[in-house]
Structures are given as structure tokens and as C-alpha cells.
Amino acid sequence: AVNYAVRATLSIAGTEVAKELQLSAVSMGYIFSAFGWAYLLMQIPGGWLLDKFGSKKVYTYSLFFWSLFTFLQGFVDMFPLAWAGISMFFMRFMLGFSEAPSFPANARIVAAWFPTKERGTASAIFNSAQYFSLALFSPLLGWLTFAWGWEHVFTVMGVIGFVLTALWIKLIHNPTDHPRMSAEELKFISENGAVVDMDHKKPGSAAASGPKLHYIKQLLSN
């Protein structure tokens, strides 16, 4: 939900941003597009990073940096007007760059934690968060823009992201590493299609460095 709320910040605060920074419709068009360009460019590299370094580590960096670049958008008015628009474009570009691994990471986490027969429901839950975020955060961020100013839309969402980063580091684990995972539960999800050791490579194994056909089969099965 926070992922999509962060994306929507500029849509909500954009009118006030354009007015204060004296940005034309064309300039705002480029700024709005920056996120999508970066998101597109980073999608496949983001998936490669997830496969190489694991879901938790990559998602941690992704969450931290998208929160950082969201937070920093609240301070672009400190630059001279000639640079403020360029700074906002850069922040939005880096936001898209940072968020790109998130949905591939969600898919990997679902594959690692849920049996095949439960995977569709689990995926639907995290995908529905985008609509939940619009219903929950849009009116709140709109009020924030009106009551406190557009800068606080970005700073508040950035701080929320920093808090979530800390919680993510503390609470999220791989199935095989989770301190509260019982042997029975691990056996159950593993035997029913969960790829529990997805992020644990076996050094020196040819299978570890090549295509994981067994995992691909499990991911595609339903």
C-alpha cells in the first residue's frame, strides 16, 4: 500500500508543486514521466539483483532508497527555481529506479512462503494493496497538502517508509531462517510447492549458477 501511495504523492501535490516552483505543464509532464522511465529501465535488472542477492536484501535497499528519494522531494523548494524542477525530475527518476524491484520481490516472497494452492490468494492480497492505498492515503495526503503544505506530503510518506524499512529488517526472514518457523510448517509448505531455499545458494554447485529448472517448474505450476 505504501509503495503505491508514494507513487501517488506527486499526483496529489502536483498542482501546488507546479505553482510554487513555477513549472509549466510541459515541465510537469517530464517530471511525471521520470518515474515510469526509470521503473521500466530497472525492471529486468531489478529481477536479476533479486535472483543474485535475495529478496530480503534487495527489498531492504529498495524500500530505504524509495523512502529517501520521497523524503527529499519535500525539500526541492530550497533550490533556486532554475534547479528546483530539475531536482524534482531527478528525485522522481530515482524513486522509479528504487521501486522497480518491489513487485518482482513480492512474487519471489510469495513463491518462497506459500504452497502452490495458496499462491493465487496470497498474490491477490498484495496486489489489492494498490487499490487499498488509493482509498486510504489519497484523502489523507490531500488533506495534508491543504493543511500543512505540499512539502509534508513527501516528508511524511518518506518517514513512514523509513519506519517500514526498520520493521522489514527486523521482522522479515526467509522461511528456513525464521525464528518462529516450526519444522512441521516448513516441511508442509516445502512439500506443497513453496521454494523455501530460493535465496540460499549452494557454493560450487553447477545447479546454483545455472537455470533453476526445478524452481521454474514450481513457479509456473498451479
Please report, for each region that a protein language model flagged, where it lies by residue.
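Helix-loop-helix hairpin linking two adjacent transmembrane segments in secondary transporters
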Residues: F126-P179
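Membrane-interface helix termini in secondary transporters
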Residues: E16, G47-W48, W143
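Residue-level signature of mid-helix packing/kink "hotspots" within the transmembrane helices
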Residues: A8, G36-I44, A100, L134-A135
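C-terminal ends and interior cores of transmembrane alpha-helices
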Residues: F64-L81
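Juxtamembrane intracellular "pre-TM" segments in multi-pass secondary transporters
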Residues: P175-N222
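Cytoplasmic helix-loop-helix junction between adjacent transmembrane helices
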Residues: M91-Y131
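Extracytoplasmic
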Residues: A1-A25
